[in-house]
Amino acid sequence: MRGTKKITEDIFWIGASDRRLSRFENIFPIPEGVSYNSYFVDDEKTVVFDTADISVSDQYIENLKEVLGDKKLDYLVVLHMEPDHCSLIDTVTAYYPDVTVVGNSKTFTFMEQFFPSAAGFKKLEVKEGDTLSTGKHTFHFVAAPMVHWPEVLLAYDDASKALFSADAFGTFGALDGGIFADEYDYEKDFLDSSRRYYANIVGKYGMQVQAALKKAAGLDIQMILSLHGPVWRKNIEWLLEKYEKWSTYTPETEEIALVYGSLYGHTKSAAEAVASGLREKGKVVKVHDVSGTDVSYLIGEVWRCKTIVLICPTYNGGVYPPMEAFLNDMIALGVQNRTFALGQNGTWAPMTVKLMTDKLSALKNVTILENTLTIKSALHSADQGQVDAFVDSIAKA
């Protein structure tokens, strides 16, 4: 069954989509599925860029055999050694034992850790600035360490002006029959997933992404071929601008993300009152229950919005546990350039605002508003003035 797609006259997509996997990296929910992309270049010397996840092995090998036909496979270029892209290396080398595996020194260190058989592979070690010529195509290797593993390489092709970008510019989401971004309404179909993918998978490494973007800026890029999601051949500047914002922790919008935690509904009522007040002031606010929303979606909202409002009860003398997990994720990912407004609820000893302030103070270039909200057990009409003042401070931030 035909599972390959032509990108150019001699570059083919030979990947597969997975709609059965429930959690990417066994962490992040992906109800939209995911694609594992691999690319074949049919030149005087044939080349495959990366393999795929073990879950799609049958489809992948069928695709590879289809595009190769009776030809030999000359090179397997490994840009990224994460198992969702490298799991079939030993399978490919078993089918094509004369193939030369291309990577850098770290690539081969990791490869032998995953596959002891890799010690016997034919290898070509490359580094930043090296090239691989296959006939019409010449691939220039660009080091992109920690985007998002230390061994990551990018490859730029002189002939097609394509950037093989490893995990950079990728997204969650299976492909629905088309492989090109311009075959979709990308902002509707993929943008939220793309942002969530970036923020949670790559977000910690903004400085390293910036370094890679600076290298890419000197290239005439006409296509971007990532290891997840659709291929870009139009409007590439739009995607690069998104990555510029995301990697510099620059909000995409003035909108407000309000995240609350509530045991019995009383803190929820306070959060709803704050959201209502912000709407009355013309602000766009999105409200999220921290207990009912996977933290990866909340992290995506942090990357999107300028202002983050956090309201939750004190729990066992600490921060409400789901909110604490969210805070820990923000700190681990190095969130920057945001404004935080904090509220708390407690029946006898509310102290969440202080504890959240202490945690958030570890972040760079953030503003924590002095005006806070404290509810004792439940929201009452006597609290309206405090709610209004809290709303005003957020609206003016």
Model-derived segments and their meaning:
Residues 4-64, 154-157, 161-165, 267:
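Conserved beta-strand hairpin/beta-sheet module of binuclear metal-dependent hydrolase folds
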Residues 5-9, 103-152, 208-211:
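Metallo-beta-lactamase
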Residues 88, 294-298:
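Short acidic active-site motifs
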Residues 148-152, 168-203, 247-251:
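Active-site-proximal loop/helix segment associated with metal-binding centers of metalloenzymes
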Residues 175, 186-224, 228-231, 273-288, ...:
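FMN-binding flavodoxin-like domain, especially the glycine-rich phosphate-binding loop
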